[in-house]
């Protein structure tokens, strides 16, 4: 599936977002649970794509980017754990990441 907009995309999701082999994109800012502490489990695996023309802000408890990708002009990523095995996180400008527990970047 695909969720796309030419404007800002802001989503507040309580528990789980599955974007396996899907696309979430914005020509402007992309904000996923960008306010406060998040318990979100974000699954962007299996060729999932998150694309932001400007800034992407992602606050999540668990982020699975196994064989997935994030492309953004700048990225603020906050998570307890990140699985980026075989995945790609590509940022043109500033990357700010806070990983509280585990980061797997094997073949990433």
Regions found by a protein language model. Name each.
Residues 1-4, 9-11, 15-19, 23-25, ...:
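Extracellular beta-strand scaffolds
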